[in-house]
Amino acid sequence: MEEKIQLKWYEKRQGIKLKDKIKSEQKKKEFLEKQNLKKNSDFEKNSQAQKKIRSLKKSKFVKPLENLFASEKIPEDAKKIIEEFDKVVESTHPLNSKQKLLLPKQIRSLSHFLTDERGERRLGYMNQTVLLSAYVHYYTWWNLVRLVRLFSNIDKKFFDVKDSSVFLDLGPGIFSVPLALFLSRPELRKKHITFYCLDISQQALAFGENIFLSVAARLKCEPWKIVRVKGELGSSVKEKADFVTSANLFNELCDDFKNPPDFLAKKCTEQILSYLKLENENARYIIVEPGDPRSARLVSLMRGSFMRRGFFPVSPCTHFCDCPMDGKKGGKWCNYAFKTDDAPAELKKLSEKSELPKERAVLSFVAFQKSKDGQIDGCNCFSDER
């Protein structure tokens, strides 16, 4: 109910007429109504703008996690090789019945050796035949499951290299990265690539090359030119590389490095840059490590270190800000995972026998490319619910 307008005693003394006051109150009311309408309109416009921004972020800047590990992007011939990888290994390095029987136990022992007994192991453990065999049948196979899935989903422009390009894989062990690249990127199979593989274990290098040649034969492809280099990170390589790769390398180096992780990241960045052909404006490097907090911390630090040297991140996040999930003590770390439901049946069976089943494959990674002017356009962020 509207309050009846009346003159106050002081208004009467001032000579104000009732009709003038009524008119003034009506104008005031109209003004307030207009102000409220404007506020509501501005609020609605702002809400719509925020919705539009969120929509743009989702459609343009944020890719859902399944895009990073879509299995349908894996070439069919690669799927077959991964499914039957145990047969590939058998064709190059067959095991007798007793060795096959002992394999799950040896894999379990190797797992303890790589985790619980970190401080006691030597970096040259791959020179031991039993450990090498266990590593190939379990870790290399799982590495291919992870890496082929990842490489198949990274933007194809990242792998658009010229014919006769030089690649270098650091600490390849059993050629996990060269194998994964050969399987996941059919366009690279057609190119004449010289692939340098650096590792401290000559035995592992020879083992890996035999498997690589066997895979190339099964795919009926001309293999890349493989150059094995026995040595540790920092050892000289004959040619500068257009493309450098590393997987599970720094996770092991951390065990023998007493300095803080930021010092290690800076040192390793300088060593990797020394291998790259820096005059090539499209020089590339990809680092892949296990998705544990310590490895993710190092990957995050390497990301920052490479950006400061004029490289930009191509995947997973292309922004130039500090990583908000940098793995500092007590904080969240950046890692990506996918379910292993469609992993090879024999691999899952072997994992069960070894008491090392995997429900998810997890990794932390960054792909870099040298920018022309140290600048990039756009921002793609992948998110994972952990």
Question: Where are the regions a protein language model picked out?
Answer:
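N-terminal auxiliary segments of SAM/dcSAM-dependent transferases
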Residues: 4-121
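Class I SAM-dependent methyltransferase Rossmann-like catalytic core
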Residues: 121-157
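Conserved class I S-adenosyl-L-methionine
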Residues: 163-173
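Conserved SAM-binding loop of SAM-dependent methyltransferases across substrates and taxa
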Residues: 174-189
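S-adenosyl-L-methionine
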Residues: 207-238
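A short SAM/SAH-binding and catalytic strip from SAM-dependent methyltransferases
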Residues: 242-262
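Conserved beta-strand signature within the Rossmann-like core of class I S-adenosyl-L-methionine
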Residues: 279-289
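C-terminal lobe and adjacent flexible extensions of AdoMet/dcAdoMet transferase-like proteins
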Residues: 344-386
